[in-house]
């Protein structure tokens, strides 16, 4: 486990898991939200985003936290390990709501409310995004170590095992 991606619905616990995994493995952690977003709440271009991701790929070790569905296959080709968070929608909405008002390493600003468009993305994740992710995982299942968490307890148990 040297090149890791952590994917799944926003609010599922990906970032918390990635941070704990980083502490255990000492692999450098990169947040896709921090790559994409600028402090003024705008974002870089897709081309620049792709170039920055490729710069991370060139490193010998990394954990990449985040979805950005357009680039999941690009990251799947480069990683050796995948952690997918497939948690209930209600848990993800609660997780996204609970982080409002808290500083985050992966965002250059403080969220003050749950954006309705973002909440809609979370509500539709299982229907719109997850099937595509599972199809990609099926494609790479013989080449990658794939771990799927259905609860935060499962991710906590995994971290306990690697201590």
Question: What residue ranges belong to the model's regions?
Answer:
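Hydrophobic anchor at the beta1->P-loop junction of P-loop NTPases
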Residues: 6
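P-loop (Walker A) phosphate-binding loop of NTP-binding proteins
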Residues: 9
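NTP-dependent small-molecule kinase module
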Residues: 24, 124-163
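Walker A/P-loop
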Residues: 15
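Conserved nucleotide-sensing/catalytic segment adjacent to the nucleotide-binding pocket
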Residues: 28-82, 87
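ATP-binding Walker
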Residues: 12
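A glycine- and Lys/Arg-enriched "phosphate-lid" helix/loop adjacent to the NTP-binding pocket
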Residues: 87-129
